[in-house]
């Protein structure tokens, strides 16, 4: 994938860029693998906004992605197409299995139309193949990693993300996450070899607010420009700093959103960014 830049023919075009979609080989999805997707506009069943800054956007169909793959062990599949998925940053690959079934997987770097992929403990170590962590050599970069055996891929699914297998000891494997966190995961958990493709997606300059609206993202308004009735930082004569530490519209201090006593925290060897040992 490459990034295409535009000449500044309009203010919205100036500086904006798009993906060139050169790796895409098919423009319409497999009909048997899509489901309708109904937007909520950030509202719950009572019609109240529970998630701000959501609403509108282009109509989408959800592509059913196979995040498990364990039921296809030993059945080879050919990559029929690399497709665009509006519901995620990564590209997806349409697989045609030898038994006639079709499925989508996340497309890693190096996977192209016509390649053959497989899953199972005896699969080769090459991009797109799915194996248990115990069968993957130390130092390999993987993605779509399970947190619990058979639970389906949960880690490293977005564009450009990858997890490094640092080592294996007993029933656990040590993984370095994209955030820098080092975590232990059961060696029976499965992972797909390679790094997720479309890494250049992070370099796209969206250029104008309208492109965010196409994606279903509404504006984010700062509290300091609101009135006192709307936000704790609102009001004041002229421009003000808010006069207090950052808080939410309901007065809760910013940050500290991570659950401090989550059961799986005991498997974290080194925290992200901070480098503190547990």
Curated annotation (Swiss-Prot):
Residues 33-57, 224-278 are annotated as: Disordered. It comes from the Bacteria. GO terms for biological process: cytoplasmic translation. The keyword Secreted does not apply. InterPro entries: NA-bd_OB-fold, Rib_uL2_dom2, Ribosomal_uL2, Ribosomal_uL2_bac/org-type, Ribosomal_uL2_C, Ribosomal_uL2_CS, Ribosomal_uL2_dom3, Ribosomal_uL2_RNA-bd_dom. One of its GO terms (molecular function) is rRNA binding. Residues 45-57, 269-278 have a biased composition (Basic residues). GO terms for cellular component: large ribosomal subunit. Keywords: Ribonucleoprotein, Ribosomal protein, RNA-binding, rRNA-binding. The keyword Zinc-finger does not apply. Residues 253-268 have a biased composition (Basic and acidic residues). Disulfide bonds: none annotated. One of the primary rRNA binding proteins. Required for association of the 30S and 50S subunits to form the 70S ribosome, for tRNA binding and peptide bond formation. It has been suggested to have peptidyltransferase activity; this is somewhat controversial. Makes several contacts with the 16S rRNA in the 70S ribosome. HAMAP family: Ribosomal_uL2_B. Belongs to the universal ribosomal protein uL2 family. Part of the 50S ribosomal subunit. Forms a bridge to the 30S subunit in the 70S ribosome. This is Large ribosomal subunit protein uL2. It comes from Mycobacteroides abscessus (strain ATCC 19977 / DSM 44196 / CCUG 20993 / CIP 104536 / JCM 13569 / NCTC 13031 / TMC 1543 / L948) (Mycobacterium abscessus).
